[in-house]
Design a protein with these regions (language model features):
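Detector for small/aliphatic-rich hydrophobic stretches
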Residues: 2-7, 14-159, 170, 406, ...
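Internal alpha/beta scaffold segment
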Residues: 265-291
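Short glycine-rich loop/turn motifs
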Residues: 48, 245-248, 347, 385-390
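C-terminal or internal capping secondary-structure element at the end of a domain, subdomain, or sheet
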Residues: 382, 387-411
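Non-catalytic, conformational "gating/processing" segments within enzyme and secreted inhibitor domains
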Residues: 101-266, 292-374
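Short, basic/aromatic recognition patches
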Residues: 371-383
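Short Gly/aromatic-enriched secondary-structure transition segments
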Residues: 90-94, 209-218, 272-281
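Soluble, non-membrane globular domain cores that form compact, hydrophobic packing
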Residues: 18-19, 136, 186, 282-285
C-alpha cells in the first residue's frame, strides 16, 4: 500500500518561532482529563478512524498517512465561528455530543499545552495560526477564542499579492522543520482567511534498530506483487496483543509517553475484514487491555512517505456538507455574508529509520466569501512484510496523533 498522510492547519504569525518553540516548559507525567474530556478524547479517536477509512477507501491502492489531531484542531478553530446547522454538523463529524460542545476548546488546549511536555527527549510541536484578509473585518470574539484555546497567532495580509502565499508557506515549513515546505498554492481577494494547524513529531526509539541488521527483504504487497525493501530487524521484548483480526506490537519512544502501534492483519484474514474491525471503540478496548511484554523477532520496513490531500469531499461525506456551501452559517466570524469553507488542504510526512520516527502534517482551511461556488513466549515473529496499519499515539490516554496504512514501502 502507499501511505496517505493527514495533517496540518496553518497558524497565526503574531507569535515568533521562538515563542512557539519555547522549551522552558514544566515536565508532565501525564495529561489528566476530566470525565467530559475523556468522552471527547474517545470521540476524536472515533473521528480519527472515520477519517482514516474514508481516505483509505478513496486511495484504495495507495499508502495513507494522516494526522486526525491536526484536522480536528482546524475544525475546532473554524467551529468557533459557526452557528446553527453548520455548527451542529462540524461537531457531529467529530462525534462531539451536544452537551459537550463547550468543552471542545478546553480539550484541545489541554493537549496543545500538555503534549509537548510529556517527554523531554521527544519533540512535539503544535502551532496554530489565523491569516486574515486585511480588507475584511473579522469579529474580535472569534479571534480571541482561537488565540486563547488554540494559542493561534494572527496576521493580516494582502491576499492579492503572491508574497502572502509565500509567507504562509514559510511559516508552515518552519513549524514542521521543513517536512511540509508548501501547503497552499494561491490566495484570492475573495478569501476571508486561512486557518492553519501544524504538528511535528520526532522521537527516538526506546529500543533502536541496528543499521547492520537492516537488509533488503521481500514485502508482499496488497496487489499480490512482491517488492524488495529495506527491512529493519531486532530481537527484543515489546508489548504485544493478538485477536481474531490483528497482531499488534507497540514500539515506545523515549520515556514511553509516546509509541507507535503496528496493526498487522492475520494471514488468514482479508484486508477488508480487518479494516471493518477498526474503529474508536475497538481502539479503546485493545489499548486498555492488559498486555505483557513478549519477546518479538521484529521486521519493520524503513519508510519515507509524503502526500497531500484535498479534504473537502471527504469532510463533506463524513457529514458536514453545509459548511462548504453558501448556506453555511459562519456569522460568528464576520458580518459579511455569505461565507463558507472553500477548501481544506492536508499535507503529511512520515520517516521511519533505525534511530527515530519523524512525522509531520499541516492542514490549511480556506474560508471564502462572494466568489463563485463550485460543489464538490517462544519468540513471536512479527514480520511487517505485508500491508499494515500504523498509529502514532500518546500512551496515557491513547490519543491518536497520526494514523496510516502501508501498502508499498517507499524509501
Amino acid at each position: 500500500m502507499k501511505s496517505d498522510f493527514f495533517c496540518i492547519i496553518i497558524g497565526l504569525l503574531l507569535f515568533s518561532c521562538e515563542q512557539v518553540e519555547d522549551v522552558s516548559r514544566i515536565q508532565l507525567d501525564e495529561i489528566s482529563f476530566t470525565q467530559k474530556e475523556n468522552v471527547i478524547n474517545n470521540s476524536i479517536n472515533s473521528f480519527s478512524f472515520d477519517l482514516f477509512h474514508l481516505l483509505s477507501n478513496q486511495n484504495s491502492t495507495e499508502n495513507v498517512f494522516v494526522s486526525p489531531f491536526s484536522v480536528s484542531c482546524a475544525l475546532g478553530m473554524v467551529n468557533n465561528g459557526a452557528s446553527g446547522i453548520t455548527h451542529l454538523e462540524i461537531r457531529h463529524v467529530m462525534h462531539i455530543p451536544d452537551s459537550l460542545a463547550s468543552s471542545l476548546n478546553n480539550y484541545h488546549l489541554k493537549l496543545i499545552d500538555g503534549l509537548p511536555c510529556l517527554d523531554s527527549s521527544v519533540t512535539v510541536k503544535i502551532a496554530n495560526s489565523m491569516w486574515l484578509n486585511e480588507e475584511v473585518l473579522v469579529k474580535k470574539q472569534f479571534k480571541q477564542k482561537n488565540t486563547t484555546a488554540y494559542k493561534a497567532v494572527s496576521q493580516q495580509l494582502d491576499f492579492s499579492k503572491s508574497e502572502s502565499v509565500d509567507k504562509i508557506n514559510r511559516w508552515v515549513s518552519r513549524q514542521t522543520e521543513d517536512c511540509i515546505p508548501k501547503i497552499i498554492s494561491d490566495l484570492s481577494p475573495d478569501n476571508l482567511m486561512v486557518l492553519v494547524n501544524c504538528i511535528y513529531f520526532q522521537g527516538n526509539w526506546q529500543s533502536p534498530f541496528e543499521k547492520s541488521d537492516t537488509h533488503k527483504e521481500q514485502f508482499f504487497c496488497a496487489d499480490k506483487t512482491v517488492k524488495d525493501v529495506y527491512m529493519m530487524h531486532q530481537l527484543a521484548s515489546f508489548p504485544y496483543r493478538k485477536n481474531e483480526c490483528f497482531e499488534m506490537a507497540t514500539f515506545p519512544y523515549g520515556n514511553g509517553s509516546y509509541a507507535m502501534t503496528v496493526l498487522l492483519p492475520n494471514v488468514d484474514k482479508s484486508w477488508r475484514e480487518c479494516m471493518d474491525m477498526l474503529d474508536g471503540n475497538s481502539w479503546k478496548t485493545w489499548m486498555n487491555d492488559s498486555t505483557d511484554n513478549m519477546l518479538l523477532d521484529v521486521k519493520l520496513p524503513k519508510l519515507l512517505l509524503k502526500n497531500k490531500y484535498q479534504m473537502r469531499e471527504i469532510l463533506s461525506a463524513m457529514g458536514m456538507p453545509n459548511a462548504f456551501t453558501p448556506r453555511a452559517d459562519f456569522t460568528g466570524i464576520t458580518e459579511k455574508m455569505p461565507v463558507w469553507i472553500e477548501e481544506v488542504i492536508h499535507a503529511s510526512y512520515l520517516e521511519l529509520n533505525e534511530k527515530e520516527t519523524k512525522a509531520s502534517a499541516a492542514t490549511a482551511l480556506k474560508v471564502t466569501f462572494e466568489s463563485e461556488w463550485v460543489p464538490i513466549e517462544p519468540v513471536i515473529p512479527f514480520y511487517a512484510n505485508r500491508p499494515f496499519v500504523l498509529v502514532i499515539h500518546e500512551t496515557g490516554n491513547n490519543t491518536i496523533l497520526f494514523i496510516g496504512k502501508v501498502f508499498y514501502p517507499e524509501k
